[in-house]
A protein has these predicted regions:
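Short, Lys/Arg-rich flexible segments
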Residues: 1-84, 89-94, 98-144
Length: 144
């Protein structure tokens, strides 16, 4: 059987070693950069869906739209890094949960058809999110 040996360039191996030692510092910054296009698209989709197709004029206060945010990047028990984009369970000035309002818009309820905003955001921003994370990772690697 034929064998081949490939020797990696020393500078490349040094950068990989540095990346390994700084991995836990780099990943949260990369995930946050990847979340930027998602949050922008989610805000525009949500703004377009609020009050859409209703019989009465919208009485939106803007609190739901303002509550859209990202969580901090955290590492789970398996070692995977996660960052969530969405509406937290905070309540608006009238005491109604923003997450409940977002879920009703997304999935509908009895007598109110669904007006999805989060699922189209996920589909539309998958490539942009990956590209943003790749660019951020390349910048972080260049810094090493």
């Amino acid at each position: 059987m034929a064998r081949a040996a490939v020797k990696m360039p020393d500078d490349f191996l040094e950068r990989i070693a540095k990346l390994n030692s700084h991995f836990d510092d780099i990943v949260p910054r990369v995930l946050e950069k990847g979340a930027e296009p998602v949050i922008q698209k989610a805000k525009s989709n949500l703004a377009a869906r609020i009050g859409q197709g209703t019989k009465e004029p919208s009485q939106s206060t803007g609190e739901l739209l303002a509550s859209l945010e990202t969580t901090k990047a955290v590492q789970d028990a398996k070692g995977d890094w996660n960052l969530r984009v969405g509406v937290p369970t905070t309540k608006d000035s009238k005491g109604v949960s923003n997450a409940l309002k977002a879920a009703v818009l997304e999935y509908g309820k009895s007598g109110q058809p669904p007006r999805p905003w989060l699922k189209p955001t996920k589909s539309a921003t998958r490539k942009a999110c990956a590209d943003a994370m790749e660019r951020a990772l390349d910048k972080e690697i260049e810094k090493l």
